[in-house]
């Protein structure tokens, strides 16, 4: 009977060890899978931000260019009439400004970096100020500030973009 008892105890101990090993392996596999899923989600978010920022650079460039054309049109009209910002924009330029501004606005709201979003909002406020100016001195100053700020925002986008590449796992 003693041999049978030892056999039974050995079988029970072996089964318990096997169950414990399976539980530990399952927990580790679940933890690894969870970590891999988190890394994948993080990389998808990083890729989305990279794509958004690259599109935003193009959109912002288009908006800056369109507003500069508005400034030049106002300048030409001022030379003819002596009044700043009183002439309506042509339909094509008006649409160009509208589409460029809309695209910049939509893309900027997708940006995760709060500082960058705030910087873009400040720039867009200066661009609006430039377009709405009714005085040549105000318009010239707004143009100078907006174009300088545009360069600064482009550099800020570049910094955020580079940080997203630097944050990749090797």
Regions found by a protein language model. Name each.
Residues 1-13, 17:
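Short hydrophobic membrane-inserting helices
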Residues 20-170:
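Conserved non-transmembrane functional hotspots
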């Amino acid at each position: 009977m003693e041999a049978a008892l030892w056999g039974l105890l050995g079988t029970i101990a072996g089964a318990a060890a096997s169950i414990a090993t399976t539980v530990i392996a399952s927990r580790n596999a679940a933890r690894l899978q969870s970590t891999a899923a988190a890394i994948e989600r993080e990389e998808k978010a990083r890729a989305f931000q990279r794509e958004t920022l690259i599109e935003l650079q193009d959109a912002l460039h288009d908006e800056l260019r369109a507003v500069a054309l508005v400034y030049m049109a106002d300048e030409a009209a001022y030379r003819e009439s002596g009044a700043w910002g009183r002439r309506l924009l042509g339909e094509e330029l008006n649409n160009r400004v509208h589409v460029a501004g809309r695209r910049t606005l939509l893309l900027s709201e997708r940006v995760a970096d709060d500082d960058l979003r705030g910087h873009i909002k400040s720039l867009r406020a200066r661009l609006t100020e430039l377009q709405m100016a009714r005085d040549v001195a105000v318009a010239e100053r707004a143009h100078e500030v907006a174009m300088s700020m545009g360069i600064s925002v482009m550099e800020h986008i570049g910094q955020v973009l580079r940080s997203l590449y630097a944050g990749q796992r090797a």
